[in-house]
From Swiss-Prot:
Record's comment describing the protein's domains: The presence of a 'disulfide through disulfide knot' structurally defines this protein as a knottin. The cysteine framework is VI/VII (C-C-CC-C-C).
Naturally occurring in which organism (per UniProt): Conus striatus
Annotated compartments: Secreted
Tissue: Expressed by the venom duct.
Primary site of residence: secreted
GO molecular function per UniProt: ion channel inhibitor activity; toxin activity
UniProt keyword terms in alphabetical order: Disulfide bond, Knottin, Secreted, Signal, Toxin
GO cellular component terms given for this protein: extracellular region
Signal peptide range in chain numbering: 1-19
Protein name: Conotoxin S6.11
Pfam family membership, one: Conotoxin
Length: 77
């Protein structure tokens, strides 16, 4: 009976340890995927309508896909 109790305790400790480790890995994987998915390419931003192409009217640099607004037009350089 003692051996069975010890065996059950060891099994419970191992299972809880595995659950803790698995939970930590899931959080790290989510953080890593969020880090890589935050920034979009110029083409993706343009395709989704989040920025303006070359020679389009603009007021701010952030409106242009290429990141430059001069004389109220998006420019590439």
């Amino acid at each position: 009976m003692e051996k069975l109790t010890i065996l059950l305790l060891v099994a419970a400790v191992l299972m809880s340890t595995q659950a803790l480790i698995q939970g930590g890995l899931d959080e790290r994987q989510k953080a890593k995927s969020n880090f890589f998915s935050k920034r979009k390419s110029n083409a993706e931003s343009w395709w989704e309508g989040e920025c303006r192409t070359w020679n389009a009217p603009c007021s701010f640099t952030s409106q242009c896909c290429f990141g430059k607004c001069a004389h109220h037009r998006c420019i590439a350089w």
